[in-house]
Amino acid sequence: MEKPIKPGRITALACMLTLLVIVFVVALYKLQIVDGKAYYEENRNSVASSQTVAAARGSILDRYGRVLVSNTSCNNLVFNPDDLFEQDDPNGILLRLARTVVSCGDTYVDELPVTTAPPFEYTDMTETQRTQLKGFLKYAKLDEEATAVELLSYCREKFEINNNYSAADMRTIAGLRYSIKTRYIDKLYLPDYVFVKDASMDLITSLKENNVPGFEVTVSYTRQYHTNLAAHLLGYTGLMNAEEYTTYKTQGYPMSATVGKDGAELAFEKYLHGTDGTAIVTKNAAGTVTGTTYTKEPEPGNQVSLTIDLDLQSAAEQSLTKGIENMKSKSTENSDAVGGGALVAVDVATGQPLAIANYPTFDLQTLFQSEENYKAVSEADNQPLFNRALLGQYSPGSTFKPCTAIAGLTEGVITTGTEIQCTGTFRKYEDTGYAPKCWIASSGTTHGNDNVTEAIRDSCNIFFYTVGDSLPIDTLARYAAAFGLGEHTGIELPESTGQMATEAVKKKLENTNWYVGDSLQAAIGQSYSLFTPLQLSEYCATIANGGTRHSASILKSVRSYDGSELIYENEAEVLSTVETGDYNWAAVQKGMYLVANDPAGSAYETFGSYGVKVAAKTGTAQLGDNQVNNAIFICYAPYDNPKVAVAVVVEHGSAGASIASIARDFLDAYFTVKTVSTAPESELSLLR
């Protein structure tokens, strides 16, 4: 039998329910009656807008995960036109903003290419500024030849700038109104106007404390360079121009997106660029943000790891700089002629570039800090911006002779035991007036009888003239192509393909016939052959590993932004092979070994007592017209277990032997075990 509910409990429950109803009614009365008007006004004056949330760009790392380029966030000031032009005096607000920026020590962006004080004249313009001005003049229906004064007169009238303002203040207001207005002119494709980039907290605080309307604070990311090395490889970023926008807009990029402009930043844009998000931002009447709701989270870009080793890159740049500047400092007849140069080191087993150095170089951290900095670098006589390692084209000189040797051996023109007598002069075509000499003839002696190994050691022109005379030029060119000379290397950065001297090349360049002398000169690396330092390093690696040419891709891997997920791992790609017998490789490799280790070798002075056995070939590329020769040098090491191949080029360096020390200094670093302070633990026991 159920127990009856006591009357007291029913009374208590009824009281509680009554109390809850009373509280609810009072709260509802306060919300709708007492505070209803205030809530209505707050809601009526609140503005919700959809805004883009910038995604961070991915970082660039070296092969061991050391950060080369990352991001740093910064606060920018941008105008809110809807808010600004609802104010009673937008021009006065703009002037107030500009003055506040200056008083806080910041700098604002004024895109009007007119001097800031009378007499008003046009300033020097970038191509973007010219396009912007042309579009504005067309919009304003002003003549393309309108003067700066006429332009400002139009701006004063169009933007209703009060005549009470001084000429300088009028110019300030006109510049800001011009910068805002051009964003709304059709087909100009300008990025969003950022009034102040990387605004200081003092400025932001001052503007907010004084309730200055018409602007917003946005967050963006700028690239931070953690090294001054590898400038030609890393590249830089920037806002899109109109031409780039036509390409990237199909991929969903907004006009204000930052994209890679050069180097790895451009080559790996698809990995580095993130996907922007969106958010609903609510503001009250004072412009204060009262709420942010993400409708799409931004997706940051991925980490890109290069094949470059930062320590080896440092060693390459230091060795190259030291070597060239030492050559310049010597009081010799040709020291003043010494120019730029390059050093490239690649992994023999994979073809991966480990270091790509140029001289002169530049510092990405300071290049774009000011127009003066960029102008000084871009207009320098020695062309620091020129990527000699990838774009420079140089005659290989005698460094080409191993290629001629392999071609001759493989085609049966010679064997490893064939001896050719050097008499100092190649006399076969003497009756036609053509009798080229060996380099040693100037000393009044000869090389005597040389086999192919000895001929490489001695760099005997007569031997290689004889081989080249028996090889059709197209056959020699086929071997050069298999070695990658005159071919794309597979690197993702802009490169020159160079050219192998052939009948077709001469016809194209000079529209003249091919003669036997052209074949002889091509066989010793002269004539019309031009190759890049990167090609020469990969060629040397192919000799070292016995005929396998790999891609020179500088992409090692791609990982997610936080490094937790592997997205892509680049594997060594074989581009071509040079098929010949092992005994032929051994003969050529031994010849290069003797260049560095036999007293008769041209690099013996540099490597004869070196702690690691090196195989090398020197080259002297004649330029004619009384110019000082270019110096070319290739080597690989260790000789009996090749790991690294190096190519060095110095413009007007006189002779290949004179730059062997640059490669030696680099190898010193290569064969030095890294210390705990500079290397991940997994590297400590490696001799690379």
Predicted regions and their residues:
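Amphipathic, well-packed alpha-helical segments that form the structural scaffold of globular domains
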Residues: 245, 273-276, 284-287, 317-325, ...
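Solvent-exposed, polar/charged alpha-helical surfaces in well-ordered, non-transmembrane soluble domains
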Residues: 91-99, 201, 205, 209, ...
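Membrane-proximal periplasmic segments of bacterial cell-envelope enzymes
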Residues: 1-272, 276-297, 333-334, 339-342
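Solvent-exposed coil/turn segments that connect beta secondary-structure elements
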Residues: 36, 58, 66, 73, ...
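Beta-lactam-recognizing serine transpeptidase/beta-lactamase-like catalytic domain environment
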Residues: 69, 75, 283-296, 308, ...
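Short alpha-helix boundary/capping segments
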Residues: 85, 89, 308, 580, ...
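Flexible helix-coil linker/hinge segments at domain or subdomain boundaries
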Residues: 672-682
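Conserved, well-ordered alpha-helix/loop/beta-strand core segments that scaffold catalytic motifs
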Residues: 289-341
